[in-house]
Swiss-Prot record:
UniProt KW keywords: ATP-binding, Chaperone, Cytoplasm, Isomerase, Nucleotide-binding
Chief location bin: cytoplasm
Complexes and interactors: Forms a cylinder of 14 subunits composed of two heptameric rings stacked back-to-back. Interacts with the co-chaperonin GroES.
InterPro entries: GROEL-like_equatorial_sf
GO MF annotation: an example: ATP binding
Reactions this protein catalyses: ATP + H2O + a folded polypeptide = ADP + phosphate + an unfolded polypeptide
Identification of the protein by name: Chaperonin GroEL
EC class (word): isomerase
Similarity comment text for this entry: Belongs to the chaperonin (HSP60) family.
EC numbers on record: 5.6.1.7
Highest taxon of the lineage: Bacteria
Length: 30
């Protein structure tokens, strides 16, 4: 159960991190 929960949370947080990183790169490159 813990691993499943961690997987769900990890997926969401990773997606958020990727979005944030993409936005940062976009801003940096202008």
């Amino acid at each position: 159960a813990k691993s499943i929960l961690l997987g769900e949370e990890g997926r969401h947080s990773m997606q958020a991190g990727v979005d944030k990183l993409a936005n940062t790169v976009k801003v940096t490159l202008g």
